[in-house]
Curated annotation (Swiss-Prot):
It is found in: Cytoplasm. GTP binds at residues 12-18, 40-42, 304, 330-332, 412-414. It comes from Rhodospirillum rubrum (strain ATCC 11170 / ATH 1.1.1 / DSM 467 / LMG 4362 / NCIMB 8255 / S1). This is Adenylosuccinate synthetase. Substrate binds at residues 298-304.
Length: 429
């Protein structure tokens, strides 16, 4: 029996929600280990659609759900989400949801700063969701953040808020924004403290006990490897490490506790917001893929940019993240296309390269080298076995496996969780 870490292998929006829910039903514990409420995922359970941003996917299935120390938590957004799922019949209690007591809090000032910076940047903006995730991580690294455990001691909270505002008010002055009052922020935090503190827990200890008891643990990542702050298309990235090895750090467990690492991978490529995208399509095929795949952000509603499958990027994600298999999603979106292209390399300054360079300028200048495969006419939608797939679809899948150097462990053929072909069980690896 193995624990499993699930991460995106592209720029996020790969369909992690469905795959995580499929695995969560079989897990005992589900853990979020990075990110904030900037990345949403959609689950369909018994015909009911849930849209989650902070809550682990196991929460809607009654599993022990954990928000790890690597997550930045907006308390107000959290309770909005808890109230939203409660209206759908899912009750979240401190017995079922544990939040790391050392998790950093996102405060209203973080969102304000995020949006002010984006507005000031003009055409050079990164394309953040404006929800304060980046500024909260900045405060964490600078050792001035407010953590969940700080809400339990008013004296400590006041000292830390005043210290925090010394920094933030200087930034706000520089942006021409009004300064913040410490008393107002402290009052807001003390008001929400009795609601969120019952969820606070030493989650590293909870996870250690679960591991010793032989419980199956599912580590749930947000965004995707190409949005990783170190390994992604910097600076057009998120503010945390999204690759699989961070599951251990962001949850408070040893690396050996993670087990099987599964990369969720679309059968094509999408991206939201600014940043390089070598295989982006600007023609009718790109628009067709976007319409068929319903490519709009769960949180932002922004249309996603669409393009051909980039095997160079995914192979890089496999190698950097130590992915042992992928879950291939949205294959059905490609049904009926006459031909399909796969990016197998890049051309840069006349040279052929097999990776995405780190330089922002070089990333924007690489040209994709394509291999063309014949498409298939029969539908793959809802297929539940390899026998249901067209031969040319199987050929496409096998070629992807060769190029990215990782096998397909799961194949998703519709948003419904039952429409999944299991090739290799991650929990039994």
């Amino acid at each position: 029996m193995s624990n499993v870490a699930v991460v995106g292998s592209q720029w996020g929006d790969e369909g992690k929600g469905k795959v995580v829910d499929w695995l969560a039903e079989r897990a005992d514990v589900v853990v979020r280990f990075q990110g904030g409420h900037n990345a949403g995922h959609t689950l369909v359970v018994d015909g009911v659609t849930y849209k989650l941003s902070l809550l682990p996917s196991g929460a809607v299935r009654g599993k022990l759900s954990i928000i790890g120390n690597g997550v930045v938590v907006d308390p107000w957004a959290l309770f909005e989400e808890i109230e939203r799922v409660a209206a759908q019949g899912v009750v979240i209690t401190p017995e079922g949801l544990r939040i790391a007591e050392n998790a950093v809090l996102i405060l209203p000032l973080h969102g304000n700063l995020d949006r002010a910076r984006e507005a000031a940047a003009g055409n050079a903006k990164i394309g953040t969701t404006g929800r304060g995730i980046g500024p909260a991580y900045e405060d964490k690294v600078a050792r001035r953040a407010i953590r969940l455990c700080d809400l339990a001691d008013e004296d400590v909270l006041r000292f830390k808020v005043e210290r925090l505002l010394t920094h933030h008010n200087a930034l706000l002055r520089g942006l021409g924004e009004p300064e913040l009052d410490a008393d107002s922020l402290i009052s807001a935090l003390l008001e929400i403290a009795p609601r969120i503190l019952p969820f606070a827990s030493p989650v590293w200890k909870v996870l250690d006990e679960a591991r010793r008891a032989g419980k199956k643990i599912l580590f749930e990542g947000a965004q995707g490897a190409m949005l990783d702050v170190d390994h992604g298309t910097y600076p057009y990235v998120t503010s945390s490490n999204t690759v699989a090895p961070n599951a251990a750090t962001g949850a408070g467990v040893g690396p050996s506790s993670v087990g099987f690492t599964l990369g969720i991978t679309k059968a094509y490529t999408t991206r939201v917001g600014a940043g390089p995208f070598p295989t982006e399509l600007f023609d009718d095929i790109g628009r067709t893929i976007g319409e068929r795949g319903r490519e709009f952000g769960t949180v932002t509603g922004r249309p996603r940019r669409c393009g051909w499958f980039d095997a160079v990027l995914v192979r890089q994600s496999v190698l950097v993240g130590g992915l042992r298999g992928i879950a291939l999603t949205k294959l059905d979106v490609l049904d009926g296309l006459d031909e399909l292209k796969i990016c197998t390399g890049y051309r840069l300054d006349g040279q052929v390269i097999d990776h995405l360079p780190a330089s922002m300028k070089a990333q924007s200048r690489v040209e994709p080298i394509y291999e063309t495969l014949e498409g298939w006419k029969d539908s793959t939608f809802g297929a539940r076995s390899w026998a249901d797939l067209p031969a040319k679809a199987i050929k496409y899948i096998r070629r992807l496996e060769e190029l990215i150097e990782a096998p397909v462990a799961l194949l998703s053929t519709s948003p419904e969780r039952e429409d999944t072909i299991l090739v290799r069980d991650p929990f039994l690896d």
